Amino acid sequence: MRNVDEKFNEWKTRATDAEILAGLKSLEADENARINAFYKDLEFGTAGLRGELGAGTNCLNVYTIRKVTQGIANCMKKHGWARASVSCDSRINSDLFARTVAEVFAANGVKTFITKELMPTPFLSYITRETKSDIGVMITASHNPAKYNGYKVYGSDGCQLADAGALEMIGYINEIDPFDVTTGTLEEYVKSGEVEYIGDDIIAAYLDEVLKRRNALAEGLTVTYTPLNGTGYKLVPAMLKRMNVAGLDIVKEQSMPDGHFTTCQIGRASCRERVFRAV
């Protein structure tokens, strides 16, 4: 097994991404941070992949995203799978990582459907089924602090992978050199039809399905809602209006996506503050 310095030097030699090169430069003077970034590879499992943003094999970045996606693409080829759906949340670099996933899939002949903007995770599950995709990928780290991001994989049923599926993919992922992944630009793949944006008609159909499943009437209710700087900032208000709420008050300072979660720091101590902001 190669040691930290060997892997660090390889990245300095082979990486071309400007953000990663800057990150590697900062690691030169910080031994502890360098060790943390390179002492292992990020581990893929049933929950997908999650890690701190930054340069290194133990961090989430464009190279580790490419590695995982190429491994999944190779696994898909074995099964004859050729369709994938991709979306992302409001976290730092989520949109970049979603683009990266789509670019690698398309380079491998996988027809890829991608949302034009960030969406809630359940929407990814929906479009995976709606587009008859074999695999769905959601770039998100759920409830974790802002310095994290993640990569969640879903099956054709819109559910997270079971243990057996994740284990099979791990074998393919471990074979990939992150600096030797064929890719291109999202724009060229959209032009060629290998990548397709999810349209407003599918978003409307999703809201229709949600509306069918409501178990209580909302007419007459006045609702205060905070997206907490996350992905619900468009679909939730749209859904509430469809439910004919009497009034809707959205917390202004938390109404727009913010990957730094500036107004709602993660942690139990801040839960009370979030409620006070809303009411």
Stretches with model-predicted labels:
Residues 49-51, 56-58, 91, 119-120, ...:
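Short, glycine-/Ser/Thr-/acidic-enriched flexible segments
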Residues 15, 33-38, 42, 149-272:
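Gly/Ser/Thr-enriched, mixed-charge loops and adjacent short helices
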Residues 273-279:
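Positively charged, low-complexity/disordered segments
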Residues 16-19, 23, 128-134, 144-157:
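N-terminal glycine-rich phosphate/adenylate-binding segment common to multiple enzyme folds
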Residues 85-148, 239-272:
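N-terminal small/polar loop signature for handling phosphorylated ligands or for N-terminal nucleophile
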Residues 2, 6-101, 108, 187-190, ...:
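An N-terminal, well-structured beta->alpha segment
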